[in-house]
């Protein structure tokens, strides 16, 4: 009788970060926005036919400077936000389209649905985009956004944040997330930020002040890397 040695145990997968719930009770409107039907898988080959192809003629360098899109300077604290887009193994992802949008320094968005009684800034639209370079790096110049009320519950205020959107090799791979600023006193009260229940994952959504990125007498600098996949993935809104 031949006794076979036991099979080696399969290597344990790295634990995945706790990502936001689709339906988070503390975030009232998530009940309306969360999926109610099964996921629809696109036909094979669709992503290859309709995948995004971006080049230097599609994204202008000025698109990454949100303070230079109008005739005058916007109001508020000028900032530089930069970092790298990495895969789960830490390898840089080049030529990735990175889009951002945000409120102005008073906490107001320019769209008609924003009812916050704060002033609009005629010199600030609050949207930009760029392509990552060969090191996977992106860079934006902007104004630090203000906090704003959002009527989710009594005395509800959103911490200052910038929305980020990233495209992979197909439009179906789009990821959306939010970047926050260090030391914000509103973190403890924000159900969107706290929908990410893993504290380490929440910390990955917070940029780090960086004196080397800061430009003398011009702008404060922040570093924020975005990791797509793996145990160290940046939490996203669409998982």
Predicted regions and their residues:
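Beta-strand-dominated extracellular/periplasmic modules and repeats
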Residues: 2-239
């Amino acid at each position: 009788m031949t006794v076979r040695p036991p099979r080696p145990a399969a290597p344990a997968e790295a634990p995945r970060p706790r990502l936001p719930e689709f339906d988070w009770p503390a975030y009232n409107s998530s009940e309306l926005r969360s999926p109610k039907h099964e996921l629809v898988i696109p036909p094979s080959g669709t992503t290859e036919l309709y995948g995004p192809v971006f080049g230097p003629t599609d994204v202008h360098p000025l698109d990454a400077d949100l303070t230079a899109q109008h005739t005058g300077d916007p109001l508020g604290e000028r900032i530089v936000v930069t970092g790298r887009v990495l895969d789960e193994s830490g390898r840089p992802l080049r030529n990735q389209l990175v889009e951002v949008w945000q409120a102005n320094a008073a906490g107001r968005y320019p769209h008609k649905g924003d009812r916050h009684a704060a002033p609009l800034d005629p010199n600030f639209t609050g949207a930009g985009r760029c392509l990552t370079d060969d090191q996977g790096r992106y860079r934006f110049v902007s104004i630090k956004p203000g906090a704003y009320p959002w009527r989710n519950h009594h005395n509800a205020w959103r911490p200052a944040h910038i929305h980020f959107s990233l495209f992979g090799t197909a439009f179906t791979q789009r990821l959306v997330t939010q970047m926050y600023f260090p030391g914000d006193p509103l973190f403890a009260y924000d159900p969107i930020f706290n929908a990410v229940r893993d504290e380490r994952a929440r910390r990955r959504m917070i940029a780090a002040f960086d004196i080397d990125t800061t430009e003398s007498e011009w702008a404060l600098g922040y570093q924020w890397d975005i990791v797509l996949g793996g145990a160290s993935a940046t939490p996203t809104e669409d998982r």
